[in-house]
């Protein structure tokens, strides 16, 4: 599926800068101005500037947006020890990885900037920067840094992108100031687009709705699969809310702020789903990036209404049994038109009616 790369990058840039612009500037500023040498050399004391920006980074650390080694003042610093900024999608952390797992070698102070899940669709579009192959996602990172007047490379720090694709030999990709030519058009896989939709919904479920913080009584991660249905538009959500509440009174709770329908009570593996969530990324990203014909394909049986609309992802939980296995199934307007809203989820394979 062909997409205009400038539109794709600009859209995600606007989304990220509108919501996280000041935070991004603050992280770059803090990483730039924290002088690690003054921490190791306690005889001269820590200067006030380093103290202030170190406090900022510790505040980001409390929000799981930065990492600082616990013994900074005792470190014997070498030229191989430095600071970093790492761009990454939040879904990387949901499977159980920690921020420490994402650190570049030798880095003891790092700030993390989270990009939208759908932006990583560009991971599979390679571009050449010098003699190195890099994912086109770096174009978004460079655009963000340039528009916010942030230096990607400083005298004591570097910037990286944690890429999910294995096509570049390693996950941590360095992002330099070197210019390169963006392709005007890029071919994106329908499968990749659908997968990123599921990952985006997964992040919303975990970090915004926080649906995994309190699992229903009777749910056992080692035995059960937690099922979530994703819908693309408010009208479909309203239909499912009204229909399910009328069909099974007292069995559901609708949160109209977070746009989610919860099944309440004891968990049963026989339930077709435990929650229905509006995936807002469809309206905020895909609807702007693609024409109507492409949107019809994405929401049809060759896309989200078929095999490409069902994914199993994991959430690193505090359960003794380990991670929670979550199945995401999209119910699209096409499925609703076929009046097949309440099937066993396996019946949706291939858009079955």
UniProtKB/Swiss-Prot annotation:
Keywords: Host-virus interaction, Inhibition of host innate immune response by virus, Suppressor of RNA silencing, Viral immunoevasion. GO terms for biological process: symbiont-mediated suppression of host innate immune response. InterPro entries: Phytoreo_Pns. Pfam families: Phytoreo_Pns. It comes from the Viruses. The keyword S-adenosyl-L-methionine does not apply. Suppressor of RNA-mediated gene silencing, also known as post-transcriptional gene silencing (PTGS), a mechanism of plant viral defense that limits the accumulation of viral RNAs. Belongs to the phytoreovirus non-structural protein 10 family. This is Suppressor of RNA-mediated gene silencing. The lineage of its organism: Viruses, Riboviria, Orthornavirae, Duplornaviricota, Resentoviricetes.
